[in-house]
Amino acid sequence: MSPKTETKASVGFKAGVKDYRLTYYTPEYETKETDILAAFRVTPQPGVPPEEAGAAVAAESSTGTWTTVWTDGLTSLDRYKGRCYHIEPVAGEENQYIAYVAYPLDLFEEGSVTNMFTSIVGNVFGFKALRALRLEDLRIPPAYSKTFQGPPHGIQVERDKLNKYGRPLLGCTIKPKLGLSAKNYGRAVYECLRGGLDFTKDDENVNSQPFMRWRDRFVFCAEAIYKAQAETGEIKGHYLNATAGTCEEMIKRAVFARELGVPIVMHDYLTGGFTANTSLAHYCRDNGLLLHIHRAMHAVIDRQRNHGMHFRVLAKALRMSGGDHIHAGTVVGKLEGERDVTLGFVDLLRDDFIEKDRSRGIYFTQDWVSMPGVLPVASGGIHVWHMPALTEIFGDDSVLQFGGGTLGHPWGNAPGAVANRVALEACVQARNEGRDLAREGNEVIREASKWSPELAAACEVWREIKFEFEAMDVL
């Protein structure tokens, strides 16, 4: 046993309080392949050494409590305790550190994101010895990730279901988000799908309100999907939001969607909760439904640089819990997303193996083994002039979603959809011909607009629209 650590079983029980670092700070520890590793941004209270702060995080998120207890002698703390094994200062920040913590795999229930988060971030964030605490990243070992189903279907299976290859998928959120009747809502869905979109979407707060009950919305949207499919010869879908007040009601809505024969449903995974989300993901795999995930409430958790949890952790958790799409920012639109950081967690969503890369905020090498990938969804304040940048940034395996950028077209919903489809096809063709979309993107759009009056009108409406604010989420 290391001389720098001690357990109550080895030294005998002595009542009282002692420093966490005596037991939970273990700089000589060599991490195991089966450990869950965490990187915390720690801001200690004045006078608290970083080693004590890091050890406190390890203790309070695993086996520790505020005082010694005699029942510690009934177990093996060296087997079950979290360990702060490395601390490094944050460059350019005063009294701020990255504390690396290793957790033994046996601390966590198999297949439960809920249990994992309850342990790692459930209680320690209110600890008085810390001014602020942020979970920056997690390394999920294959021994744990293999206990999860993951996404219901994944990227390749979705493409096969939709018979759509070689380009990003195109979507639209129906607006106004609240207040439409079910029939008028279905009309907007039909017009957008008929104009060339692959998907339309319920907004995250469309559930089952007095102005539009869920069953009515589902029926009219299904009618719109089938009509648009018959007229275009393409497979279409609408993200029917199954989020509800109870898990039982959520599954009932998903069952009805399956009975209607539609291809995809939707869930607000943070407000709905990980237990509900995992249940829905299992139902979707068993019944052939794709699952679109909205991240409503994420900025409450991830936007502050010094406290909370980075979205890359929420993205990893979603891949484990299950979802085929998830909103991931745009880099260029109205919602938060710095390019390198955004592409870092986009790769964590899509790829099988991601190398450690601190320049993109990736603290650990992550091996997902054979877990299916998740399509990132770019949505929020984007329009046709953004299409070249979005195509270049996100690549083919993505969903580009234009709400106001479709329904705000001066000629109506269907022309708005036409404009976006023409712009996307032009950008994909230009890229495939070897043109540089980052440099020539505007010219590509101008050339395409000569052959599409719908695109020309969209270009005129949105030529001056920009969202130029400094990103909060930077390295």
From Swiss-Prot:
Keywords: Acetylation, Calvin cycle, Carbon dioxide fixation, Chloroplast, Disulfide bond, Lyase, Magnesium, Metal-binding, Methylation, Monooxygenase, Oxidoreductase, Photorespiration, Photosynthesis, Plastid. The record marks K334 as: Transition state stabilizer. The active site is at K175, H294. PROSITE patterns: RUBISCO_LARGE. Mg(2+) binds at K201, D203, E204. One of its GO terms (cellular component) is chloroplast. The modification N6,N6,N6-trimethyllysine is found at K14. Substrate binds at N123, T173, K177, R295, H327, S379. Its EC number is 4.1.1.39. It is found in: Plastid, Chloroplast. It catalyses: 2 (2R)-3-phosphoglycerate + 2 H(+) = D-ribulose 1,5-bisphosphate + CO2 + H2O; D-ribulose 1,5-bisphosphate + O2 = 2-phosphoglycolate + (2R)-3-phosphoglycerate + 2 H(+). InterPro entries: RuBisCO, RuBisCo_large_chain_AS, RuBisCO_lsu_C, RuBisCO_lsu_C_sf, RuBisCO_lsu_fd_N, RuBisCO_lsu_N_sf, RuBisCO_lsuI. Its cofactor is Mg(2+). RuBisCO catalyzes two reactions: the carboxylation of D-ribulose 1,5-bisphosphate, the primary event in carbon dioxide fixation, as well as the oxidative fragmentation of the pentose substrate in the photorespiration process. Both reactions occur simultaneously and in competition at the same active site. The basic functional RuBisCO is composed of a large chain homodimer in a 'head-to-tail' conformation. In form I RuBisCO this homodimer is arranged in a barrel-like tetramer with the small subunits forming a tetrameric 'cap' on each end of the 'barrel'. Heterohexadecamer of 8 large chains and 8 small chains; disulfide-linked. The disulfide link is formed within the large subunit homodimers. Belongs to the RuBisCO large chain family. Type I subfamily. HAMAP family: RuBisCO_L_type1. This is Ribulose bisphosphate carboxylase large chain. It comes from Illicium oligandrum. The gene is rbcL.
